[in-house]
A protein has these predicted regions:
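Extracellular/luminal ectodomains and secreted, surface-exposed scaffolds of diverse proteins
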Residues: 468-490
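A generic structural signal for beta-strand entry/edge sites
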Residues: 325-327, 353, 431-435, 448, ...
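Accessory, solvent-exposed terminal regions and/or long lumenal/extracellular loops of proteins
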Residues: 367-468, 489-490
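Surface-exposed loop/edge segments in extracytoplasmic proteins
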Residues: 339, 345-348, 460-462, 468-473
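Catalytic-domain carbohydrate-binding cleft regions of carbohydrate-active enzymes
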Residues: 1-362, 368
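Intrinsically disordered, low-complexity acidic/polar segments
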Residues: 40-42, 169, 326, 374, ...
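Generic alpha-helical propensity signal that fires on short helical segments
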Residues: 13, 47-53, 122, 176-180, ...
């Protein structure tokens, strides 16, 4: 009947779900299944759910509560109830996870279909109302998914994404901003939303690129959304339109070169982004940071409304968010020198507002004078391509530190020390000293690295590695072909 019955496979579209997952996994494609907590009246598993007392109740507790749902009235699993969680977990394991996927996508988990604020929740046997407990359901739905993933795939790192969450959701799931409107205003709102979530403790956040309600995005809007989106902690072009069509980048042929360049930047920056995720997991620092978080002594940063932000502590990002823009107004925080990453690292003194010319290819980004950024050209497919060569971009006007973090990307062996954590300490001065201290038992796939040190005032006289002078090359091709050495790029 073409209705949405969660956990029930459409055998016309997916005659062999397990075989489908096996084939996708063999191709290196992670498939994530969209799950919603509402149960329609004709759901094939409704009797089993009823027998296990899995639903939210009416205010007097005499029966199951029915509310608005996709395709008609539905009941809603009570995630404050041990029975509700266990029943959901059993269905999730049998019909989804054991078929071959290791990921869970919890949608509509804000429980807006339960409109009666007095509807009754179990709350571990203590009873309570939706008015009191609604905010807990999304977290407990993610918690239940995490338990299920651990039970089906012990030793594997769980990946869960939630549309909603309360304080603490970052312990269980990545989140996104829900169904957003397709317009230029939303692009700006999305940046503010991610920044706000980050300083609220939820760093692993993103928004649907291209919009999820409204007409198909115009080509310039989609491009600017992607150019910003590739730097979001969660990057996903998940765009649908009111005419029931979807948005894909290859539909915008004129913009494809710029879209490819943006995607490529995301992959180049994965070592830096992954390290920022690690940092966030340790001390809660967001990946996207409002200017005032990095520059609390600069009053201008508190009032800046230009949607400029820091990506980690090293890179200032000023995405182009105005239709037809020819320039981008950017405030560069005081106390630092800033290097334009798209203009041969042209330096700018901090504490000033600049007007930067932009075109469709522009993704304005500035390197801070204490920056340490790890990048690579190796990765085109995250699950297949090993990291062989690492580029480390350093601006050493002042002392700085950075932790480059790496592990296998999927298991929980990092909890037992199977990781590679390299502390990079830069001491600025007439002689710039860069110290690497490695920790952990992970056998890194990195075989070589290039340190790119920005020096606009004067070139290096010599370079040494462990007190051994390295050979200087005059011709770049000779330097690139050598096992070691240094080269000054004029």
């Amino acid at each position: 009947d073409n209705l949405r019955y969660v956990f029930n496979w459409n055998k016309k579209r997916f005659p062999e779900p397990k075989q489908f997952f096996d084939e996708m996994n063999a191709r290196g494609i992670n498939v994530i299944v969209n799950l919603k907590p509402g149960i329609l009246a004709r759901h094939p598993y409704k009797q089993w759910l009823e027998e296990h007392n899995a639903f939210i109740k009416t205010p007097d507790g005499s029966g199951d509560y029915y509310g608005r749902w996709w395709g008609g009235p539905g009941r809603f699993v009570d995630f404050t109830s041990p029975s509700g969680r266990d029943t959901w977990k059993a269905l999730l394991k049998k019909h989804i996870l054991e078929m071959g996927t290791k990921t869970v996508w919890n949608d509509n988990c804000e429980m807006d279909g339960v409109e009666d604020r007095e509807a009754q929740c179990d709350f571990e046997g203590q009873k309570g109302t939706m008015a009191e407990l609604k905010i807990l359901h999304s977290n407990m739905m993610a918690y239940t998914a995490k338990q299920a993933l651990h039970e089906v795939y012990p030793g594997e790192r769980p990946y869960i994404i939630n549309r909603a969450g309360y304080a603490g959701i970052q312990r269980y799931a990545q989140v996104w901003g829900g169904d957003n409107l397709t317009d230029w205003r939303t692009l700006k709102f999305n940046i503010a939303t991610i920044l706000g979530m980050g300083i609220s403790g939820c760093a692993n956040m993103g928004c649907d690129i291209g919009g999820f309600a409204g007409p198909a995005p115009e080509e310039e809007l989609l491009l600017r959304w992607i150019q910003n989106g590739v730097l979001q902690p969660r990057f996903c072009l998940n765009s649908a339109n009111n005419d029931n069509t979807v948005t894909q980048p290859w539909m915008y042929e004129k913009m494809l070169p710029h879209i490819r360049a943006a995607y490529r930047l995301r992959y180049r920056m994965l070592p830096y982004l992954y390290s920022l995720f690690y940092e966030s997991s340790q001390d809660g620092m967001p990946i996207w940071r409002p200017l005032f978080l990095e520059f609390p002594q600069d009053p201008q940063c508190y009032g800046d409304q230009s949607l400029t932000f820091m990506l980690g502590s090293s890179i200032l990002v000023a995405s182009v968010v105005e239709k037809g823009a020819k320039t981008r107004t950017i405030y560069l925080p005081n106390g630092s020198t800033w290097y334009d990453m798209n203009d041969d690292f042209r330096p700018y003194t901090g504490g000033q507002t600049i007007e930067l010319p932009v075109d469709l290819a522009s993704m304005p980004m500035f390197l801070r004078d204490t920056a340490v950024v790890t990048m690579t050209e190796d990765i085109h497919h995250i699950l297949k391509d090993p990291l062989r060569h690492l580029d480390i971009l350093i601006a050493a006007e002042n002392d700085s530190t950075f932790v480059w973090y790496d592990d296998d990307g999927h298991s929980e062996q990092y909890k037992d020390g199977v990781y590679a954590k390299t502390a990079i300490a830069v001491t600025a001065g007439e002689q710039t000293k860069i110290c690497f201290v490695a920790q952990g038992n992970y056998q890194s796939t990195v075989q070589s690295l290039t340190v790119k040190l920005i020096s606009k005032d004067k070139g290096a006289y010599w370079v040494a590695l462990d007190n051994t002078l390295l050979k200087q090359f005059i011709i770049q091709d000779d330097w690139e072909a050598a096992d070691s050495g240094w080269y000054y790029d004029l």
